[in-house]
């Protein structure tokens, strides 16, 4: 067993190797502060046939024992990965995936298991460090060292590993990963920060990343691991030369420049089939399937180089646009009669339908994860059905990609929402991607913002998003605005920026190259800002402010406050009082025991108002001398029990009935209404009444009765 230690950011970072998981090809047990993770890396013996990508899987296992908790619910063990675990797995996957050899076809599985968790040291950040180490000490081909860090921004200072208070009171929460040379991955949210501050944050993060990578280099200097060779199949003799001879570059250009996505795909596929047949004929090959993978690989490379060359040399993109040009945009709101808010945002061949549903406070999402307990009142769900790209696939639950895209759009919008005190509704936004050709997550931000205003949610400002790309050649750096799927696939960087007219609210970046300079990143962010302003103008033209009224189909929520000491009276013995209010007025009621805040939800404003009025009445202090009307609930030989408010029952003793006591007691029955005056409240809160007859002056009652 080997162990290495280094103090970083005022915490001890400890790495152990050879103590646990020794049968794994690579493993690392890493402790940073009180967070401990185990990362393992393994590879299959055989390559997977018929694929053209690295078959990498990253799993992030949350173990509740790491936080000293037992899982909630009926089943007391961890089940399928939670949404937070999936997001953490994606966060680890993104910086390590580009570092595998492009021709690797053996299955690789990286598993990060959280064994102990410190709230101020995110396990996913430690997981990036541990996964990098596990891969580098394994026999798996892996070409680099990466690390990650979480960064906050508060009171003008950047903070590495910020506390929850720093995040809540600060302006930024981003996770950054990279190599010793450059930042390669960013994911996070902000409260309208400037582009300059974002670049400074990445520079600050990279200074910490370099120290983390340096520590890994120190550890890895003690290892001399022989990596598995990546076996590349050799194409048949003469195939590469035949492909070069038969490829017509002008014809390929023409097909790449077909403006419509589906037509372009068909045109390119047809030309690939044509080349395959021509090569087979030239080489006298009868087994087309045998040479097809080699031809496909050569063709893919030719398409990539040609698309990039057209942009660099001629400034023309596949759909005919210039590098800074945005596709045509259209916005519509109020599409459906019964939804609470709706919007259709279309940018070229990417289209998002945003739907807003307003719910009661009790409709919140209950959160019970490794690091979080509580509720979530704003949710954004992103759906990417197969028809949006004209494909046929089985419909199952949300994919990791759908969860990740929805999370990014949610982070872009959430800081523009009104506080719960001003708008007590639970808010759900659903984005249905109806067409997709690049940047559907940023289209989701736009449709979500439009739909929120259409629903009458008092958001502070519109939020728009744009996806940017980069073509990096030895003699050129071309930044692309509003990339399509093809440019995302063949480009060197994909970064998405969302924000208002005043600043950035969400940012995501993935770099396929070794990294980009601060100057280039700043240029790209400013180009993205121009695009964002253009999109925001189109959105404000469609709907410039939240609608003044909510949909008539949205639930009605009204809020009142009672003395916390009176909450028990409102609830009543065994919940009898509150249950009766709920039943009588067809409402839902939520009461905060500590603050006395009462939320009443219903479909009828009249009923909600009546319920609120009754709750206030119940919570109102009953005073000695007060005259009330109540119903007889019980008759005893010594007097009557009268309920003057729900749950508030007192005694009208026979001696307090008045001169016609006997005649009155003979006639009275349960359910009769009687006017009484409170003459005493004892130490236990029990009420004593006297009967008030018609025309009786009761003002004197307050002066010579007292509350004991």
UniProtKB/Swiss-Prot annotation:
InterPro entries (UniProt xref): ExoRNase_PH_dom1, ExoRNase_PH_dom2, ExoRNase_PH_dom2_sf, KH_dom, KH_dom_type_1, KH_dom_type_1_sf, NA-bd_OB-fold, PNPase
A GO CC annotation given for this chain: cytosol
Binding residues for Mg(2+): 488, 494
PROSITE patterns: KH_TYPE_1, S1
Domain KH: 555-615
Major localisation: cytoplasm
NCBIfam families, per the entry: polynuc_phos (TIGR03591), PRK11824.1 (NF008805)
Protein family membership: Belongs to the polyribonucleotide nucleotidyltransferase family.
Name of the protein this chain belongs to: Polyribonucleotide nucleotidyltransferase
Organism: Thermotoga maritima (strain ATCC 43589 / DSM 3109 / JCM 10099 / NBRC 100826 / MSB8)
């Amino acid at each position: 067993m080997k162990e290495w230690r280094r103090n970083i950011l005022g915490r001890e970072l400890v790495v152990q190797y050879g103590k646990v998981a020794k049968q794994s090809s690579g493993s690392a047990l890493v402790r940073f502060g009180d967070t401990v993770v185990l990362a393992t890396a393994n590879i299959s013996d055989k390559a997977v046939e018929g694929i053209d990508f690295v078959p990498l899987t990253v799993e992030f296992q949350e173990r509740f024992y790491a936080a000293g908790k037992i899982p909630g619910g009926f089943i007391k063990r961890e089940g399928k990965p939670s949404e937070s675990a999936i997001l953490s797995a994606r966060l680890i996957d993104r910086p390590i995936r580009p570092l595998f050899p492009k021709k690797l076809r053996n299955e690789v599985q990286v598993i990060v298991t959280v064994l102990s968790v410190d709230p101020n040291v995110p396990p996913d950040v430690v997981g990036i460090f541990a996964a990098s180490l596990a891969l580098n000490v394994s026999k798996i081909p892996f070409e680099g060292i990466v690390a990650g860090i979480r960064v906050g921004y508060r009171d003008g200072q950047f903070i590495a590993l910020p506390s929850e208070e720093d995040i809540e009171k600060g302006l930024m929460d981003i996770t950054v990963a990279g190599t010793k040379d450059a930042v390669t991955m960013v994911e996070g949210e902000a409260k309208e920060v400037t582009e300059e501050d974002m670049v400074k944050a990445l520079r600050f993060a990279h200074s910490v990343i370099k120290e983390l990578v340096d520590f890994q280099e120190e550890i890895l200097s003690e290892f001399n691991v022989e990596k598995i060779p990546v076996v590349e199949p050799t194409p048949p003799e003469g195939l590469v030369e035949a492909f070069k001879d038969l490829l017509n570059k002008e014809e390929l250009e023409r097909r790449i420049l077909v403006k419509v996505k589906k037509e372009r795909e068909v045109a390119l596929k047809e030309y690939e089939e044509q080349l395959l047949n021509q090569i087979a004929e030239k080489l006298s090959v009868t087994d087309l399937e045998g040479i097809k993978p080699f031809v496909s690989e050569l063709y893919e490379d030719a398409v990539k180089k040609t698309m990039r060359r057209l942009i660099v040399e001629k400034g023309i993109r596949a759909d005919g646009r210039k590098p800074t040009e945005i596709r045509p945009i259209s916005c519509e709101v109020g599409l459906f009669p019964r939804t609470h808010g709706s919007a259709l945002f279309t940018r070229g061949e990417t289209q998002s339908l945003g739907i807003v549903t307003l719910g009661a406070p009790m409709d919140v999402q209950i959160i019970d994860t490794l690091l979080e307990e509580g509720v979530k009142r704003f949710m954004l769900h992103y759906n990417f059905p197969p028809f949006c790209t004209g494909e046929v696939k089985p419909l199952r639950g949300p994919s990791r990609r759908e969860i990740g895209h929805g999370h990014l759009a949610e982070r872009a919008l959430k800081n523009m929402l009104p506080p719960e005190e001003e708008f007590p509704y639970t808010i759900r936004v659903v984005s249905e991607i109806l067409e997709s050709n690049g940047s559907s997550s940023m289209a989701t931000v736009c449709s979500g913002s439009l739909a929120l205003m259409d629903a009458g949610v008092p958001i502070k400002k519109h939020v728009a998003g744009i996806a940017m790309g980069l073509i990096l050649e030895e003699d050129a750096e071309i930044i692309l605005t509003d990339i399509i799927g093809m440019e995302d696939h063949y480009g060197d960087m994909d970064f998405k920026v969302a924000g208002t007219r005043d600043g950035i609210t969400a940012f995501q970046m993935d770099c396929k190259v070794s990294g980009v300079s601060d100057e280039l990143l700043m240029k790209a962010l400013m180009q993205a800002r121009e695009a964002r302003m253009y999109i925001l103008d189109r959105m404000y033209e469609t709907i410039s402010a939240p609608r003044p009224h909510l949909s008539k189909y949205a639930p009605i929520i009204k809020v009142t406050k009672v003395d916390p000491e009176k909450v028990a009276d409102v609830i009543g013995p065994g919940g009898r009082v509150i249950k009766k209010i709920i039943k009588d007025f067809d409402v839902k009621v939520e009461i905060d025991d500590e603050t006395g805040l009462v939320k009443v939800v219903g479909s009828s404003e009249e009923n909600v108002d009546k319920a609120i009025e009754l709750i206030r009445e119940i919570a109102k202090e009953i005073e000695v001398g007060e005259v009330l009307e109540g119903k007889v609930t019980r008759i005893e030989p010594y007097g009557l029990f009268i309920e003057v408010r729900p749950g508030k029952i007192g005694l009208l003793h026979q001696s307090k009935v008045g001169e016609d006591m006997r005649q009155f007691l003979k006639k009275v029955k349960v359910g009769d209404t009687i006017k009484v005056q409170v003459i005493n409240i004892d130490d236990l809160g029990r009420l004593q009444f006297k009967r008030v007859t018609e025309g009786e002056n009761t003002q004197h009652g307050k002066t010579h009765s007292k509350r004991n």
